[in-house]
Amino acid sequence: MVDNYNNNNILPTNTSTTTTTNTTITPTPPLPPPPPISNILDNNNNNNLIKNDIKNDKVAVSNSNVRPSSSSVSYENSDWNKVYNSEREKLHEVNKQILNIKRPSTSIVRVSQLDSARLDEEILDLLRSQFMKIFTFFKPNFIHNFQPEINLVLKSVIYKLSIFNLGTTYGNQLQNLTYRNEKAFDPIRGSDQLNKLTMRQKWLSGLINIGGEWLWTRINRYLINNNWSEHPPNDIRKKFWNFLNFAESAYKALALLNFLTFLFNGKYVTLVNRILHMRLVYAHPTLSRNISFEYMNRLLVWHGFTEFILFIMPLINIDRIKSFLYRLLVKTSFGNSSGNNNNTASNPLQQLQKQQLLIQQQQMALAKCPICMNDPISMPYSADCGHLFCYYCIKTSCMIDSSFTCPRCNSLISNIKRFSIQD
């Protein structure tokens, strides 16, 4: 009877035998624990295999009290080990298939990348316009002579505070973009992996974009000021001039080719970014892109309102409205003044003083055109009421408004005539 059977396969002693001979039974080598394939193998099959092994060992021990040599089941030839090997091969095949699967590439909206570049340019222009106000009282040619150095300082400051410190520009931050070291990117780890730029990439990008532009501008100015293009073709200066022109044309052609490639795959906006493997990717891939049409709606409303005003303005006679309001105000003031005159009729001295004051004001006013206030009146014309106007003023007012009234006496003007001293 078997009392216990542990993992070390220690054989139990047979208590039913009467033999007094002490035999030493060497235990079989311990089996290593099976690898973790419980998710693949069926538990019932494992239990059946273990029970069969135990029965075979018990039969072998009961027949002979010595260690079995040829009848024992070896570890390499056991059934569960064969199943394990077959399942492991299947897992290796699945792993190879997973590695060979082409992962989806990182797709960045091209419009966002172009908008970020445009925002960076506008930030630079804004700072430049503010910075140029410092040199308002300098010599006129100072800004022209040191324009490359001013741009160098401004771009260096912006580059230090943006890409060098943050790894991205301010325009990229507004578009949820950042630079990624595409050379160190591993596609197997997924497109969400973000490799920061190295110091070498940052320094080279600054030297090429900022220092290279300044050096190129200075060289061109020096060559133009010294007339290197007018030397003979065999002169070394002329050859150097031709080489620079060829280099500039080649750079523009490569930049155009890079831009067309960018429109095709959307990877690198500029040629320098492609050379240095600096690609723009989303800083937060899971961030939702909220699009607000509030500004667009407001712009459309004001645009429609402006078009309506421009359409209706020619149909409105502004001068006629002004004349109507003026007549209304004059009638109101005239009625108030007449009421006051009735109240003050009892005081003849005050009434005489007011009449003299009104005569002086009228004499001063007659020297000016009541419409344009020009002094002296140009080509004076008199109306039905006897007041003088400039010919252009009175003629235009009567053509615009057929019921035009005199601004001085509020009487309707129907005829005008040339004023002369004999009149």
Curated annotation (Swiss-Prot):
GO terms for biological process: peroxisome organization; protein import into peroxisome matrix; protein ubiquitination. Pfam families: Pex2_Pex12, zf-C3HC4. A zinc finger (RING-type) spans 369-410. Residues 27-37 have a biased composition (Pro residues). CDD domains: RING-HC_PEX2. GO terms for molecular function: transferase activity; zinc ion binding. Residues 1-26 have a biased composition (Low complexity). It is found in: Peroxisome membrane. GO terms for cellular component: peroxisomal membrane. Pathway: Protein modification; protein ubiquitination. Residues 137-142, 225-234, 317-423 are cytoplasmic. It is a multi-pass membrane protein. Keywords: Membrane, Metal-binding, Peroxisome, Peroxisome biogenesis, Protein transport, Transferase, Transmembrane, Transmembrane helix, Transport, Ubl conjugation pathway, Zinc, Zinc-finger. Residues 1-46 are annotated as: Disordered. The three subunits of the retrotranslocation channel (PEX2, PEX10 and PEX12) coassemble in the membrane into a channel with an open 10 Angstrom pore. The RING-type zinc-fingers that catalyze PEX5 receptor ubiquitination are positioned above the pore on the cytosolic side of the complex. E3 ubiquitin-protein ligase component of a retrotranslocation channel required for peroxisome organization by mediating export of the PEX5 receptor from peroxisomes to the cytosol, thereby promoting PEX5 recycling. The retrotranslocation channel is composed of PEX2, PEX10 and PEX12; each subunit contributing transmembrane segments that coassemble into an open channel that specifically allows the passage of PEX5 through the peroxisomal membrane. PEX2 also regulates peroxisome organization by acting as a E3 ubiquitin-protein ligase. Component of the PEX2-PEX10-PEX12 retrotranslocation channel. This is Peroxisome biogenesis factor 2. It comes from Dictyostelium discoideum (Social amoeba). The gene is pex2.
